[in-house]
Amino acid sequence: MIKVDGLPYWRLSGFYFLFFLTIGCFMPYWSLYLKSLGMNAEAIGILSAIIVVTKIFSSFIWGWIVDYTGKRMHVIRYTSFFSLFSFCFVLFFQDFWSLFIILLIFSIFWSAALPQVEATTLSHLGEESDRYTTVRIWGSISFIIAVVALGNFFDYYPINYLLPIVIFSMALVWIHSLFIPEVSSSYQKSDNSTFKAILFKPR
């Protein structure tokens, strides 16, 4: 039995569900969509790797912004919206360089949400961090559902349906983020929240 108490359990687990539902819709089938555009293996590899590569620097930048402002949920909401907004441009462009630029911008915003939601979840859990798995598991469930469901769906329908499905799922992520409460705390932004201070901060 899941004990909710003061934890916004369904709002947090709902975000994981929708976020990984989106990933389950997008990641396994994105290369198939690119192949349908006539792109070769090299182009598909590059356009598929952008999301992974941008995490190297973008997560650090968004983490610094959160540390500086103390507005974690604001960052999650804004980046979720601009992820949706930027990805919509994929509907209008099909050439390599246009998609490269669109995905680069999209990836910078998209990579912000999950690390900050993880931090928000752990902050809400406080000393009950052992309950983290009961929240996070919904992401695993939705990922499996998305992969299996779309695998069967694309046996009967063209891969072009992928884009509206992903966009709809991203819209749900953004809308749901509006209902996750900020962690109430006496958070004070640090005077040392600079790139240099964070980079050389001993762990």
Spans of model-derived segments:
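Juxtamembrane intracellular "pre-TM" segments in multi-pass secondary transporters
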Residues: 1-7, 177-203
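Helix-loop boundary and gating motifs at the non-cytosolic
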Residues: 2-55, 203
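Hydrophobic core of transmembrane alpha-helices in multi-pass small-molecule transporters
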Residues: 17, 86-90, 96-114, 120
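Residue-level signature of mid-helix packing/kink "hotspots" within the transmembrane helices
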Residues: 52-60, 143-144, 148
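Helix-to-loop junctions at the C-terminal end of transmembrane segments
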Residues: 57-71, 154-155
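Structural signature of the two symmetry-related core transmembrane helices
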Residues: 74-89, 167
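Symmetry-related core transmembrane helices of the 12-TM Major Facilitator Superfamily/SLC fold
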Residues: 84, 146, 161-179
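Glycine-rich segments within core transmembrane alpha-helices of 12-TM secondary carriers
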Residues: 129-150
